[in-house]
Amino acid sequence: MAKQGSKEKKGYPELKEVIKATCKIRVGPGKETLTEGNCLWALKTIDFIFEDLKTEPWTITKMYTVWDRLKGLTPEETSKREFASLQATLACIMCSQMGMKPETVQAAKGIISMKEGLHENKEAKGEKVEQLYPNLEKHREVYPIVNLQAGGRSWKAVESVVFQQLQTVAMQHGLVSEDFERQLAYYATTWTSKDILEVLAMMPGNRAQKELIQGKLNEEAERWVRQNPPGPNVLTVDQIMGVGQTNQQASQANMDQARQICLQWVITALRSVRHMSHRPGNPMLVKQKNTESYEDFIARLLEAIDAEPVTDPIKTYLKVTLSYTNASTDCQKQMDRTLGTRVQQATVEEKMQACRDVGSEGFKMQLLAQALRPQGKAGHKGVNQKCYNCGKPGHLARQCRQGIICHHCGKRGHMQKDCRQKKQQGNNRRGPRVVPSAPPML
């Protein structure tokens, strides 16, 4: 049993870099990231569920096989939360394996849901489609909607190369930049409405900007409802946004107008938010000055947000978000110390209470005291120094006259890292044990 436990502790070396990348994905906006233990929990759980796949290497093909099998399982009522966490963690690992870098777990699930169209019914329908349309692969190299030679249309998920190119443009130039708008308008001409909105949601960018974009899309939808009363040949908002449609239905010719309207709404929203960003008085440009108190900064910020022509929920979101992101470094550190992990969701009043003393003489004296506090260096000698070897004050461990003691075997003359007894056990190069644990989400 001891040998078996030692072998399991080795983990999954072929996924070392993948797990490292997965640990950068957040459970949600502003929340904690996944841990190595979360990833190991998911992988070990999958090995227990599908024992026939346990010996196979963790390739992307195996991950898609596991993903398809998990979709066919129905968990018990008491295990639904753990099952949902298992699927979400696997989606994050799959994205990292493919080289993608989603910001949140929800974004990773969206990426996999987009790409799984390539794998649905692949074995059952692949040969038949190739026989009917031998030139299909040549025509559907890039675009999700493909015109077939025999008539009709087929759908293919957005290529990862195109998705990564859009991600790069969004990171370099900004989500609402003209460069990103041009790239999106070029590629999205043959995307379904669902493709357009999902790709936009998974792009990196300022959360406040994304909230403003969503607000502009809602305004366009409300304007469409007012100007187009329900009728037999009138498109509904759900049809335009691709709600309740399969990918095959959304790719047909009768949905061309809906896709064009959806793309135009998205471009209009991007331009509106971009114009807001460059307009004087834009809330996202209101930042706390070095000599400005947090209360004065909040007063300017709230005034700018209240002047924006957006809905109340968006105003509330901007107040909660920008009151932290646009604050000074000292105020952000103070809020982190006082409010902890919920700093992004805390109210403006709580943040003002946390920063009430920032900038005062007492706060400056506290910072000065921390900066001048001895850090245990060789130049700082005093009675408060304590030797970790003999436990007596007045000197450091390297100055101790009693000699070096090994904390592993208790003998003198060598340190723990050089202990021969430790080397004989074969554990000298192993790091701390990572305990598999379910991710705290869903």
Curated annotation (Swiss-Prot):
<dbReference type="Pfam" id="PF19317">
    <property type="entry name" value="Gag_p24_C"/>
</dbReference>
<dbReference type="InterPro" id="IPR050195">
    <property type="entry name" value="Primate_lentivir_Gag_pol-like"/>
</dbReference>
<dbReference type="InterPro" id="IPR036875">
    <property type="entry name" value="Znf_CCHC_sf"/>
</dbReference>
<keyword id="KW-1188">Viral release from host cell</keyword>
<feature type="region of interest" description="Disordered">
    <location>
        <begin position="420"/>
        <end position="442"/>
    </location>
</feature>
<keyword id="KW-0863">Zinc-finger</keyword>
<keyword id="KW-1187">Viral budding via the host ESCRT complexes</keyword>
<keyword id="KW-1198">Viral budding</keyword>
<feature type="zinc finger region" description="CCHC-type 2">
    <location>
        <begin position="404"/>
        <end position="421"/>
    </location>
</feature>
<keyword id="KW-0862">Zinc</keyword>
<dbReference type="InterPro" id="IPR008919">
    <property type="entry name" value="Retrov_capsid_N"/>
</dbReference>
<feature type="zinc finger region" description="CCHC-type 1">
    <location>
        <begin position="385"/>
        <end position="402"/>
    </location>
</feature>
<dbReference type="InterPro" id="IPR001878">
    <property type="entry name" value="Znf_CCHC"/>
</dbReference>
<dbReference type="GO" id="GO:0003676">
    <property type="term" value="F:nucleic acid binding"/>
</dbReference>
<dbReference type="GO" id="GO:0039702">
    <property type="term" value="P:viral budding via host ESCRT complex"/>
</dbReference>
<keyword id="KW-0479">Metal-binding</keyword>
<protein>
    <recommendedName>
        <fullName>Gag polyprotein</fullName>
    </recommendedName>
</protein>
<comment type="similarity">
    <text>Belongs to the Ovine/caprine lentivirus group gag polyprotein family.</text>
</comment>
<dbReference type="InterPro" id="IPR008916">
    <property type="entry name" value="Retrov_capsid_C"/>
</dbReference>
<dbReference type="InterPro" id="IPR045345">
    <property type="entry name" value="Gag_p24_C"/>
</dbReference>
<feature type="site" description="Cleavage; by viral protease">
    <location>
        <begin position="363"/>
        <end position="364"/>
    </location>
</feature>
<keyword id="KW-0677">Repeat</keyword>
<keyword id="KW-0167">Capsid protein</keyword>
<dbReference type="GO" id="GO:0019028">
    <property type="term" value="C:viral capsid"/>
</dbReference>
<dbReference type="Pfam" id="PF00098">
    <property type="entry name" value="zf-CCHC"/>
</dbReference>
<dbReference type="Pfam" id="PF00607">
    <property type="entry name" value="Gag_p24"/>
</dbReference>
<keyword id="KW-0946">Virion</keyword>
<feature type="short sequence motif" description="PTAP/PSAP motif">
    <location>
        <begin position="436"/>
        <end position="439"/>
    </location>
</feature>
<dbReference type="GO" id="GO:0008270">
    <property type="term" value="F:zinc ion binding"/>
</dbReference>
<keyword id="KW-0945">Host-virus interaction</keyword>
<dbReference type="GO" id="GO:0075523">
    <property type="term" value="P:viral translational frameshifting"/>
</dbReference>
